[in-house]
Amino acid sequence: IDWEQYIEKGKTFAVDSVVYSEEFRNSRFVTYKVKDAIVDQFREETGDRPNISVSNPDIRLHIHIAEDEATLCLDSSGESLHRRGYRQESVEAPLNEVLAAGIIMMTGWKGDCDLIDPMCGSGTIAIEAALIARNISPGVFRKEFAFEKWQDFDQKLFDEIYNDDSQEREFT
């Protein structure tokens, strides 16, 4: 893999791994080996070493090893998609946002009648219902997606798609 196509000079990266294998028993070992291979390739090709940022990398890579198969992925989302971005403070909700939205969609409710939230703890069902009723996309409150830091990211195209209100979400 030509990592220069994905990690620009001056950008940071991180690797995390999930391992289910007899050969590789330690996911941390796999993480370090992949990171070292990328750093070594950069040094050989450019003479520079890319920086690592575990907490807030520009580029995040995931490696998944299942027995004798490995999959290396470039993270396009960043923070987990179930974190919608509408909460000011982190609360421990017994029901995550994606599950709440799924439950509402399975009922067929679209905002054209009353909705009763029998759990009404942290308000996750009520908030997701309001978003569905107003046809507000789930990711609209996110500060950023990981793909926005990619070299080939097209801000103009993203803004065009992001701000396009011509398509309503269809729930079946």
Language-model region placement:
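SAM-dependent Rossmann-like transferase core, predominantly class I methyltransferases
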Residues: 72-106
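Non-catalytic nucleic-acid substrate-recognition regions in nucleic-acid-modifying enzymes
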Residues: 1-57
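A generic local secondary-structure boundary/capping motif
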Residues: 3-5, 51, 60-62, 106, ...
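Residue-level signature of catalytic and energy-coupling elements of molecular machines
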Residues: 15, 63, 103
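A generic beta-sheet turn/junction motif
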Residues: 56, 65-67, 122
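C-terminal edge-of-domain segments
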Residues: 61-74
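Conserved S-adenosyl-L-methionine
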Residues: 95-172
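Short glycine/proline-rich turn/loop motifs
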Residues: 18, 82-84, 169-170
